[in-house]
């Protein structure tokens, strides 16, 4: 995929997520190899979707999965989307979240 192609896919994903969540969406953070600038041609797009009131992980995951799948298919790239409550994002000691806070790039 061309370098700019994954960015268009990410923009489309963020746009659809905004449409679903509205004011509950507090941000989208790109993390992993794309955020570090180390991505290869086949690298996926790793995102944390930061929400107000993300009290039921699987409910939000099930809302995000079809969006990520649809955009992934449209752009021939893999998007992973993990929902997380804003307070968990700010305070978690989970290594994935700590790493996303350290090297992540806010895209929304």
Model region roles, listed by residue range:
Residues 1-26, 36-41, 52-108:
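Catalytic core of pol beta-like nucleotidyltransferases
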């Amino acid at each position: 995929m061309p370098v700019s192609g994954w960015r268009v896919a990410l923009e489309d994903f963020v746009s659809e997520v905004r449409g679903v969540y509205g004011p509950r969406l507090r941000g989208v953070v790109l993390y992993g190899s794309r955020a570090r600038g180390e991505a290869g041609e086949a690298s996926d797009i790793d995102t944390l979707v930061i929400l107000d009131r993300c009290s039921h992980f699987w409910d939000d995951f099930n809302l995000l999965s079809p969006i990520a799948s649809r955009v992934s298919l449209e752009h021939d790239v893999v998007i992973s989307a993990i929902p997380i409550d804003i307070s968990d994002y700010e305070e978690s000691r989970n290594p994935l979240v700590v790493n996303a806070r350290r090297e992540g790039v806010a895209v929304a």
